[in-house]
């Protein structure tokens, strides 16, 4: 704004390319430069200027106008600011052609004592722009009084104040600008800029003189410039009485400088991924406040103070005072200020306190509380602090809720013993944490419990084998009952909150919680932070949610307030790690309350390696010793690793040949042969144990265990796995019988026919019938070089898989 206002008039000059080229070539010609120099000297010659004024005076007299050139004589200079943007100078000058100041006695205004009322005639010239030494532009105005007025000003201080106030007021009223009267200062110089004569035009008493007889009329009428000339019969020649000069009033208040506030955001490409948790925050990272101080030479005279959402600036000589209310609370301890002397601007950069900014509830309109109170859509609950949070939503207030419930330390042993299974939702939300598939040894399937809170949407199949669990229709009916109770049905008084679908991502210094619940009411979102845990409760229009998070004792959270961002589809909460706990954590615990915490693992290399060791190293040994299989890596990409495993012949080939068909080393079985062999020789199919294909999805938490022929290639993709799944002897979840170790060894392994698989996307099918088979140790890996065909057998093999972004197109375009 300031730059646009101070721009030169040459910026409006519209020249074509041809005209620019002509000017360039002309000024490169020495003859043209000589002629141009002579022209400049001619128009600046005082004698030529005098002749020019005489000719203009004679021409205007012929048109009935008396023209007098007013040459300003130096007096004193006032320095101030123009519209709060750049400097301005007012030359208080004198000339004998201006009227003499006069006074008359009269009563004072407002009942004050009698005094003198002065009349100060003046002549005002248009402003002129000049460029300073550093390129900054300033404006100069000339206000011309009679020499007697300046003489009185030099001898009387109060008269001088009145004269200066009259000059400033004349410039403001005539040109429609705003001058800083409070900080107007008298300089030691007598004149600023190059003197330019002004013109006084007054109509002649007789009007336009008659045209001499015999002189032919002109071909063209007189132009109306610069104004309409008075008629000959006009008698309105009396001058109107001059308005009384302003009295010497009290010193005005300090000037409020112009300022602008810019919200600065940091662009991060990961906020523009194709994922629900990737969204730019509406709260800016910094506020940049630019304050225009055109009269301030040094910041030593200014005092700046920032408190919360208020910025205060005070200055003496020049007098500035600013009280600016900021849109967000800022961290004044990390702010910085810089003064640009060239532009006379103070730039203050203030980081936004994200925790304080996001804790403030949005200002509710007057209609919102009435609608919420009338409909009463929010379900009521009698569960402690959650009920208080729900009351805040119904009343539309932001009062703090009641006492927080205590959070106990997580007990991994208890989590294993209870064996509650809380699956993640079926949708793929791009998380990097998994929930362990806890199949404990000492707990029967009938003793395992699964609360309804494990199903946030009500459309996930039951994970327990009990026939009394809720079906999809029953869960849908339960949701309708919940909505009915929220509407105030007399049959129900309250409902219990449920655990929301939650995902947790981590980096070196923070945790990001993604709450996949649409329509969250921001005013009901409350959290309680502790070094080892975090409690959260919130509600929507028709349901309530509550959850408790715990972490290992060695993993501590920072006491800094969490960063919260609520959208229409979800909510994101960022928890900072304590400085001594920076790094990647292994596990976290989540549940409805501290009694129902369940362990969940983060996706990292340590957890993946541990799970592979559990899967590939079975605790039971096969009755018949098999030769270690050969593992061949077929394909290794950023997204998946494809492995082909072949079982070698047994060391006692006679035993297998007596049963029927032998296992051909290095030759995979066709589907027909595999089906025939499994139908005719169950023992042979038992000896050829199926190899499981483990798929690890980085976008979800489901496990896909796929059983098939040993010759089928096995794929290890980037999906998260369940490291806690114990590869115990097989058992059926419907049965609650507990077997001993000896009995487990004698259980016959069922034969999995072609096409059978247990899909990890449906946890109910996995847990209702969980089949775990003995897998021989994979001691060697046969790797084939795709270029020269050479084969290399590796016994100690380590694989590192690179990560890939979900939407690499954004990075390719960058």
Swiss-Prot record:
Keyword presence, Phosphoprotein: yes
Record's keyword terms, sorted: Cytoplasm, Phosphoprotein
Main localization category: cytoplasm
Region ranges (Disordered): 234-259, 357-490, 654-686
GO biological process: axonemal dynein complex assembly; cilium-dependent cell motility; epithelial cilium movement involved in extracellular fluid movement; establishment of left/right asymmetry; establishment of localization in cell; in utero embryonic development; inner dynein arm assembly; outer dynein arm assembly
The keyword Phosphoprotein appears for this protein: yes
Function according to Swiss-Prot or TrEMBL: Required for cytoplasmic pre-assembly of axonemal dyneins, thereby playing a central role in motility in cilia and flagella. Involved in pre-assembly of dynein arm complexes in the cytoplasm before intraflagellar transport loads them for the ciliary compartment.
Low complexity biased stretches: 234-246, 675-686
GO cellular component, one term: extracellular region
UniProt-recorded name of the protein: Protein kintoun
Gene: Dnaaf2
Compartments (UniProt record): Cytoplasm; Dynein axonemal particle
PANTHER family found in the cross-reference section: PIH1 DOMAIN-CONTAINING PROTEIN 1, PROTEIN KINTOUN
